């Protein structure tokens, strides 16, 4: 049930939040400071997919890559092969139906460490979105390709003295037990 909520959040809530955001072209033009923010697509993004949250990761990363005008190639964890390939089918179909070009969303089919390393080191890849274990995230940073990663979850919780203690404890327990504590 928690995975369903994650997929719903990764798709509907994220889409609703960003659908009207301008991400390409002139985003902001401050005439007073004479500063302009310009969004430019990076090109091809490689996305590492963990075994713990494969479907929501694929949905979310597809949305943010396409919204920013980029292509994305996924490298799923071998232990999540079936659900990752199914999620990829769904997002590829949705992208095509929305008018995206063929091949803008894809994934490697040979799920080996060597294939992932080759993808991360490719000169055609502009950015790696690394979600996964510590070793894979380190390998992404060591590849020489710019990398954005999510670190390990399960951070500590702090209850400030003015907080409603019962509510804070309830919220912490809910957050730590949601999806068995998997971020």
Stretches with model-predicted labels:
Residues 27-72, 77-89:
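Substrate-binding/gating loop at the entrance of the active-site cleft, primarily
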Residues 1-34:
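N-terminal Rossmann-like NAD(P)+-binding subdomain of aldehyde/semialdehyde dehydrogenases
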Residues 67, 137-183:
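ALDH superfamily catalytic-core signature
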Residues 56, 74, 106-109, 129-132, ...:
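General beta-strand structural signal in soluble alpha/beta enzymes
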Residues 93-108:
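A glycine-rich helix N-cap at a beta->alpha junction
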Residues 43, 125-126:
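Conserved acidic residues
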Residues 53-60, 66, 84, 130, ...:
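Short glycine/serine/threonine-rich phosphate/pyrophosphate-binding segments
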Residues 23-37, 106-125:
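A structured beta-alpha segment of the ubiquitous adenosine-cofactor-binding alpha/beta core
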């Amino acid at each position: 049930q928690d995975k369903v909520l994650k997929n719903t959040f990764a798709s509907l809530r994220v889409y609703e939040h960003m659908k009207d955001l301008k991400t390409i072209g002139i985003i902001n033009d401050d005439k007073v400071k004479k500063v302009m923010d310009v969004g430019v697509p990076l090109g091809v993004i490689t996305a590492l997919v963990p075994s713990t949250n494969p479907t929501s990761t694929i949905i979310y990363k597809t949305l943010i890559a396409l919204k920013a005008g980029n292509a994305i190639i996924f490298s799923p964890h071998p232990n999540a092969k079936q659900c990752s390939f199914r999620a990829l089918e769904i997002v590829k179909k949705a992208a095509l139906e929305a008018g995206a070009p063929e091949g803008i969303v894809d994934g490697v089919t040979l799920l080996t460490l060597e294939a992932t390393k080759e993808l991360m080191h490719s000169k055609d890849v502009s950015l790696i979105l690394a979600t996964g274990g510590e070793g894979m995230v380190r390998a992404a940073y060591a590849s020489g390709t710019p990398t954005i990663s999510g670190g390990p979850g399960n951070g500590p919780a702090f209850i400030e003295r003015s907080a409603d203690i019962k509510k804070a404890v309830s919220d912490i327990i809910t957050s730590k037990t949601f999806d068995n504590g998997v971020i």
